[in-house]
Amino acid sequence: MTKNIGKITQIISAVVDVKFTNNSKLPAILNALECYSDNQRIVLEVVQHIGDDTVRCIAMDSTEGLVRGLEVVDTGSPICIPVGTATLGRIMNVVGESIDGKGEIKSSNVSSIYKPAPSFTNQSSERTILVTGIKVVDLLAPYTKGGKIGLFGGAGVGKTVLIMELINNVAKAHGGYTVFAGVGERTREGNDLYHEMIDSGVINLEEPEKSKVALVYGQMDEPPGARARVALSGLTIAESFRDMNEGQDVLFFVDNIFRFTQAGSEVSALLGRVPSAVGYQPTLATDMGALQERITSTKHGSITSVQAIYVPADDLTDPAPATSFAHLDATTVLSRQIAELGIYPAVDPLDSNSQVLDPMIVGEEHYSVARQVQQVLQTYKSLQDIIAILGMDELSEEDKLTVSRARKIQRFLSQPFHVAEVFTGVEGKFVDLADTIEGFKGLVEGQYDGLPEAAFYMVGTIDEAIEKARTLK
């Protein structure tokens, strides 16, 4: 078969125009084109047809070194990456090339990064709780197996640390495979995560096929084309694991979905599209839907997705985080006000929610305790203005008791993390769901009214709080 060959006619940042002449066929939209600069393979993706013989492409790598007149070959298909067990324990980039210095990823299976979402008839609607061992999450905004979970927060409130703890608690305890997509985040964090996974045994360097995780990185220093597609590459690997074995539950972590949107916005501007609200691409909802609708459970297995979502200027109404909300089963909102109190994880217990916090799914006791906890915290929140102006003395005895319990609940929602041991020097805790419910039930019923507030700060179970209270006296 004769190769379809074109030549570069224009390069503007990450946008490259390629002209195909001599009666050669124009490559289809989303086809991958290849060219070589200084023996380095550069992949271009077709996004527009201009006139009869030119295509406009987005580069998946730096365009440094590219020149007009350089030969470009049409691969005849979209970007394809290796999938299956050969990817375990390895790090690849958006086009499936290894970036861990351990040679090519050799797999008998390759797959296009573009696929339709599973049909309605193939999807599964079964709902079971995924226990994370993090009290505030398990009690107030529980996660569901095969669900989509969003971690919302501004800069520096702990999204990545929470994702790391979830990988630690869930991926290690969980028998299936995990895929981590690093989308436009810090390279240092990606490197730290890789080495932590080696230390903890999640990645086995001697026998990579025994590893439990595959990593796909398109970090901050990558061009927008790579950052806009790397989440799709990660999802393609997760889908291959889900469909490979019957009943396989795959964990898919994305850090950060906002960078996926941001990269789409950069690409859109480079292509000269008219921006929509706040400068985002006009296709924001379509791009988000194309990614999110593929993250789902089928009759073969499920993909449970945890996505960190940066909130620009702490504004949840910004179009990027707001578009994500519609697709999620549970939202965990991280609050700067709670972080300022020194309470970590800085999860907002009133803003966070979950579709599975339903007595039919979690049980009557869990639902009742969660709602009582939220009621106490909501009452405390409404009393804060009065306390700030008039002081605690002006409150009724009942309100004083509510405030006291709320402050204890607030502190008991904090918890030492395993991944933060190196910073805090405090051993991380995994708390079972039954212990979490028992502890908070006792708090709202007033069983621990006599214990000091400090006893509830940074402990695991209620027994640890009682033990800590003894040492404080």
From Swiss-Prot:
SUPFAM superfamilies (alphabetical): C-terminal domain of alpha and beta subunits of F1 ATP synthase, N-terminal domain of alpha and beta subunits of F1 ATP synthase, P-loop containing nucleoside triphosphate hydrolases
Q: Name one Pfam family in it.
A: ATP-synt_ab
Give one GO term, molecular function aspect: ATP hydrolysis activity
InterPro entries to which the protein is assigned, alphabetical: AAA+_ATPase (IPR003593), ATP-synt_VA_C (IPR055190), ATP_synth_F1_bsu (IPR005722), ATPase_a/bsu_AS (IPR020003), ATPase_alpha/beta_chains (IPR050053), ATPase_F1/V1/A1_a/bsu_N (IPR004100), ATPase_F1/V1/A1_a/bsu_N_sf (IPR036121), ATPase_F1/V1/A1_a/bsu_nucl-bd (IPR000194)
Q: Does the keyword DNA damage apply?
A: no
Catalytic reaction annotation: ATP + H2O + 4 H(+)(in) = ADP + phosphate + 5 H(+)(out)
Identify the residues that bind ATP.
153-160
Which EC number(s) does the record attach to this protein? 7.1.2.2
Q: Name one GO cellular component term.
A: proton-transporting ATP synthase complex
- PROSITE patterns in the cross-refs: ATPASE_ALPHA_BETA
- Give UniProt keywords alphabetically: ATP synthesis, ATP-binding, Cell inner membrane, Cell membrane, CF(1), Hydrogen ion transport, Ion transport, Membrane, Nucleotide-binding, Translocase, Transport
- SMART domains, A to Z: AAA (SM00382)
Q: How does it sit in the membrane?
A: Peripheral membrane protein
Cystine pairs: none
Extract the coiled-coil ranges from the record. none
Under CDD domains, the record lists: ATP-synt_F1_beta_C, ATP-synt_F1_beta_N, F1-ATPase_beta_CD
Cellular compartments annotated: Cell inner membrane
- Superkingdom in the source lineage: Bacteria
- Its primary localisation, in coarse terms, equals membrane
- Membership in a protein family: Belongs to the ATPase alpha/beta chains family.
Cite the NCBIfam families for this sequence.
atpD
Its job: Produces ATP from ADP in the presence of a proton gradient across the membrane. The catalytic sites are hosted primarily by the beta subunits.
Its assembly, as annotated, is:
F-type ATPases have 2 components, CF(1) - the catalytic core - and CF(0) - the membrane proton channel. CF(1) has five subunits: alpha(3), beta(3), gamma(1), delta(1), epsilon(1). CF(0) has three main subunits: a(1), b(2) and c(9-12). The alpha and beta chains form an alternating ring which encloses part of the gamma chain. CF(1) is attached to CF(0) by a central stalk formed by the gamma and epsilon chains, while a peripheral stalk is formed by the delta and b chains.
Protein name, UniProt field: ATP synthase subunit beta
Biological source species: Rickettsia canadensis (strain McKiel)
Q: What is the lineage of its organism?
A: Bacteria, Pseudomonadati, Pseudomonadota, Alphaproteobacteria, Rickettsiales
